[in-house]
């Protein structure tokens, strides 16, 4: 997306979208060829610096303006000027009234556009998609966007900008930018967020500065289920954090299956009532699609945006937003309150780009609450340093303690070609008596061999397996939810975000490096989640007792110890 550089009688440099050239007011002096926004902003910086020095000297403004044109022509490699006949200084200035003429007869369309871009950061390609959804020409959307820029409600920013000796993407913050020669000189392209569309130094983003809400709201909040005692305690602390705490961040460390998401609903309702915008974010879209019906159930009548890669409608209206962390990159300082679920999950964990995007989606003085059952070491360090408030939710709703994993050591490796299963047939039969079995393995290559192995030893059982790239994955998991399998073999794709009634868990090769303490806690957290089946069996089968296994078991025991101390669980014999 390119812009025309404009110049007024005072020597002030401005710009106008290239697609809007026909709408330029009469008397505007501009370059004949459009330029990338970054070059125009360099020219603006150049003229502003010269104004502060002796460059201008004395004399008529017309002579000064001619000198600026000459210098800018040299600076921009010989660009030629389109100079109209001028009658007054006002002829050089793009007035708000002239820009507003672009919406004459399109007031309803402009209103729709205005509501859909609040707090957004959008590329030219995304603005064209919005034009298709509003069933209008892209040039009209461009005029609407520039009108907001002229009214200081938004700005155009280069997608990738020079930073020191390198570059930085303005959408995801990435500094590892691919550099290449262009017609306009050296240019940079960000590959980190390319799935959202191109981001180069020759492109520009429309960045809207307005919040999603313009005032207090009447919010209908009707919780479907009352909060438990443990949830009420945590919910009160979340509310106190939002209202009173000077700290900008909090960590809600919850037991698996304790209902941490619902704990945040009362605080979200209060924030909306106060005119604050709220975002529920998560790395994985299946979490978003799981939370969406629960939010819609408890917030009837509240418009909610649900934004994931699989949702066909990209632009929605709503004061309450549910989005994957990738979709959050399309917002800029839009939210007063952000709840991030599963902060330790892929692809957010370890992604500086997604972390940068989430931070920059928060408004100044906004609050960020991380929700997880398995906090990262970095988050725990922030808590210890006093930079992040810690809130604990150690108990599930049924007041049973969390099941503790049992470690069973074996000499033989857990390669499916080994004779291990023949030695443990009775063990698996014993576990099956307690409920259906979910078996976790560390490698995709182990799935089918173990499925075949189990089928050979248990011919009467219904046995299946799946992994991330399995084309039948969703159908198999649907059948698993319906209880159609006696035993199911999986990689870590099922370690979180799924509740299976009466399931028992076995982790084969639990000492494998891919199974860190967070993965092991999450896998153990599949057991005992419902009131009908509040307990169960978790077995870590391994050749050794790894540090991750010890840490995972210690974390689970610590949750039970804290819950018992607070009177949130009952002793069981």
Task: Go through each PLM region and give its residues.
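Interdomain "pre-motor" coupling segment immediately N-terminal to P-loop NTPase/helicase cores
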Residues: 116, 123, 129-214
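N-terminal pre-P-loop "Q-motif" helix
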Residues: 223-248
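Conserved strand-helix element at the start of the C-terminal RecA-like helicase core
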Residues: 251-261, 271-272, 276-291, 427-455
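Conserved helicase motor
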Residues: 282-290, 294-296, 304-316, 323-330, ...
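Conserved RecA-like helicase motor core of SF1/SF2 enzymes
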Residues: 342-346, 481-486, 490-534, 542-547, ...
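Conserved segment of the helicase C-terminal RecA-like domain
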Residues: 363-378, 524-555
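Conserved interdomain linker/interface between the two RecA-like ATPase lobes of SF2 helicase motors
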Residues: 387-451, 463
């Amino acid at each position: 997306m390119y812009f025309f550089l404009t110049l007024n009688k005072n020597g002030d440099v401005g710009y106008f979208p290239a697609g809007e050239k026909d709408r330029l007011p009469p008397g505007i002096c501009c370059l004949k060829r459009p330029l990338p926004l970054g070059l125009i902003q360099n020219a603006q910086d150049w003229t502003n610096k010269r104004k502060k020095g002796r460059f201008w000297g004395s004399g008529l403004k017309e002579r000064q303006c001619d000198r600026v044109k000459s210098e800018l022509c040299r600076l921009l490699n010989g660009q030629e000027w389109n100079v109209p006949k001028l009658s007054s200084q006002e002829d050089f200035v793009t007035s708000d009234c002239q820009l507003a003429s672009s919406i004459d007869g399109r007031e309803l369309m402009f209103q729709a556009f205005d509501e859909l871009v609040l707090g957004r950061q959008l590329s030219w390609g995304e603005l064209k998609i919005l034009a298709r959804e509003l069933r209008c020409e892209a040039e009209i959307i461009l005029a609407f966007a520039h009108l907001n820029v002229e009214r200081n409600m938004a700005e155009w920013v280069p997608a990738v900008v020079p930073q020191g000796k390198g570059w930085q993407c303005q959408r995801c913050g990435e500094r590892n930018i691919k550099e290449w020669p262009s017609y306009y000189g050296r240019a940079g392209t960000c590959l980190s967020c390319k799935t959202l569309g191109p981001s180069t130094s020759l492109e520009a983003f429309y960045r809207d500065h307005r919040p999603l809400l313009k005032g207090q709201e009447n919010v209908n909040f009707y919780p479907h289920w009352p909060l438990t005692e443990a949830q009420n305690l945590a919910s009160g602390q979340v509310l106190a954090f939002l209202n009173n705490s000077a700290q900008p961040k909090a960590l809600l460390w919850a037991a698996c299956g304790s209902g941490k998401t619902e704990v945040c609903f009362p605080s979200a309702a209060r924030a909306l009532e106060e005119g604050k915008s709220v975002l529920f974010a998560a790395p994985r879209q299946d979490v978003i699609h799981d939370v969406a019906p629960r939010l819609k159930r408890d917030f009837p009548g509240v418009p909610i945006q649900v934004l994931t890669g699989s949702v066909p409608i990209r632009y929605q209206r709503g004061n309450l937003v549910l989005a994957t962390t990738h979709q959050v990159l399309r917002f800029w300082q839009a939210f007063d309150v952000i709840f991030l679920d599963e902060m330790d999950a892929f692809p957010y964990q370890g992604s500086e780009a997604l972390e940068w995007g989430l931070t920059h989606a928060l408004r100044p003085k906004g609050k960020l609450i991380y929700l997880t059952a398995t906090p990262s070491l970095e988050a725990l360090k922030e808590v210890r340093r006093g930079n992040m408030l810690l809130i604990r939710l150690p108990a599930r709703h049924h007041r049973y303690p969390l099941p503790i994993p049992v470690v069973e050591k074996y000499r033989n490796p857990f390669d499916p070609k080994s004779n291990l299963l023949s030695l443990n047939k009775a063990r698996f039969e014993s576990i099956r008596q307690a409920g259906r079995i979910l078996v976790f393995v560390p490698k995709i290559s182990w799935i089918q061999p173990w499925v075949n192995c189990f089928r050979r030893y248990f011919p009467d059982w219904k046995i299946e397996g799946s992994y991330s790239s399995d084309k039948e994955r969703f159908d198999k998991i649907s059948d698993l939810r319906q209880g159609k399998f006696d035993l199911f073999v999986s990689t870590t794709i099922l370690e979180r975000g799924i509740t299976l009634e009466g399931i028992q868990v076995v982790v084969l090769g639990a000492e494998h490096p891919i199974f860190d303490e967070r993965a092991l806690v999450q896998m153990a957290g599949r057991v005992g989640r419902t009131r009908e089946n509040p307990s169960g069996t978790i077995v870590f089968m391994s050749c050794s007792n790894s540090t991750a296994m010890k840490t995972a078991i210690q974390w689970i025991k610590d949750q039970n110890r804290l819950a018992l101390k607070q009177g949130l669980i009952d002793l069981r014999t």
